[in-house]
Amino acid sequence: SQKISSKSKIYTICKMEHAGGLLAQTLPAYEIGAEIHIEKFNAFDFCKKINNFTHTHITPDHGRAISLTKSFKNLNLNGLWITCGSEPVDWELITKFVEKGCIFMVNWGMTEIGPCAINTVFKNIETVLDYKSKAIKGTLMGDDVYCDTKIENKTLHVKGNISVYANEWFDTKDIVKKNIYNHYYIQGRLTN
């Protein structure tokens, strides 16, 4: 779903024990022989180095830190693929990065299910505004779905080939609702 090829250059800044660090891009890139660069996250270094790469995965906290640097104002991200997830991704962050020219994928996944299970790719601000105009309560998870889903007792249940549970339903404990356009929104998480 992220268009990674053997010619891709992956910039991994998420911790490797984190699904966004290892599973979302790094391991798939390794498997196909793409170039991988792994380093500890630093917002200033990110802005200096990002244009040497084709793909990266950030968390919303990374995105906010990057957007607060002085370098972000003049940063050109044209053609770069940025996947963002691990925590809910708000419209402000999506807009900031898409306005910089990148392809921005809002992503939801879990280690148990697969790192890229539900997502939406934004290539221009018009698409962001269209999705935002159709938003419901919560934050967007996506509308491209790579597993079977059902919402039962308000929580998202998943199964499928990308899940470690295969054909058994797994309760994610995420409180999820779909709008009339089948866009998934996370509205919270059960704590018990």
Where are these regions (language model features)?
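Ser/Thr-glycine-rich phosphate-binding loops at phosphate-binding pockets of nucleotides
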Residues: 1, 110-113, 172
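Short, well-ordered beta-strand segments
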Residues: 9-12, 156-157
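Conserved AMP-binding/adenylation subdomain of ANL enzymes
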Residues: 2-9, 17-55, 69
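Short Gly/Pro-enriched turn/cap motifs at secondary-structure boundaries
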Residues: 135-143
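Gly/Ser/Thr-rich phosphate-binding loop
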Residues: 55-58, 67-134
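Conserved ATP-binding/catalytic segment of the ANL
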Residues: 139, 150, 155-192
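Alpha-helix capping/helix-boundary segments
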Residues: 43, 62-63, 89
